[in-house]
């Protein structure tokens, strides 16, 4: 389920953190489907997080932590990654959060 909203206006940072975490679970399900098993993940390389927010909102990293924290919980040291957390004015369908994940496999 995609949640619409603007972080810092219609959604709190904590709500957005939890939604980002759900996005992380979705990304892991896609990875498992594509790879056959998450055991094939050697390293989480990079996460790019897009947070829909107003121009004065500066807490994008706190929102992106929802995905980052999950990846470290699941993969330990292999879950530590480079990251960009970007604030944007709009996302498809009015979504509040979107993410891309780069994974190194074995």
Task: Give the role of each language-model region.
Residues 1-106:
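Short, polar/acidic, helix-capping and beta-turn segments at strand->helix junctions
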